[in-house]
């Protein structure tokens, strides 16, 4: 890959990252504000939703053949990579353990992993049925 193409790829990912991170903040905050509970529902929702969308797009982007590597990177790495929050998830779980909220932390970890993988599988299979 030449320098110009690589730079365009990096810029595509960066723009997608800005979109995904901003979307994550807006959606996560809105969902969290609906709850009086300290459980991180907003982050959980973003991780599951992002996994669902990635599952739906993963096959369709590959099969459609109309998307360039830059568009795939823009969506998958940029938007969805910054929309889902695994590093923030890890910190949130650690802080729960540190506060002594062991049960809440374990429930959060299990739900995050199981529902995110389920969302990915569901998204993949829904679009496989359609296309």
Protein language model regions, located:
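Membrane-interface helix-loop junctions in multi-pass transporters/channels
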Residues: 1-131
């Amino acid at each position: 890959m030449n320098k110009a193409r690589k730079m365009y790829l990096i810029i595509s990912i960066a723009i997608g990252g800005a979109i995904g991170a901003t979307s994550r903040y807006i959606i996560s905050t809105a969902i969290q504000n609906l709850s009086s509970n300290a459980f991180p529902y907003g982050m959980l929702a973003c991780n599951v939703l992002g996994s669902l969308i990635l599952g739906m797009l993963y096959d369709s982007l590959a099969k459609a053949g109309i998307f360039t590597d830059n568009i795939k990177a823009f969506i998958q790495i940029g938007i969805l990579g910054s929309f889902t929050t695994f590093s923030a998830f890890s910190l949130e779980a650690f802080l729960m353990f540190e506060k002594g909220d062991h049960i809440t932390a374990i429930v959060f970890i299990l739900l995050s992993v199981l529902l995110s993988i389920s969302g990915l599988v569901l998204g993949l299979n829904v679009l496989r049925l359609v296309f």
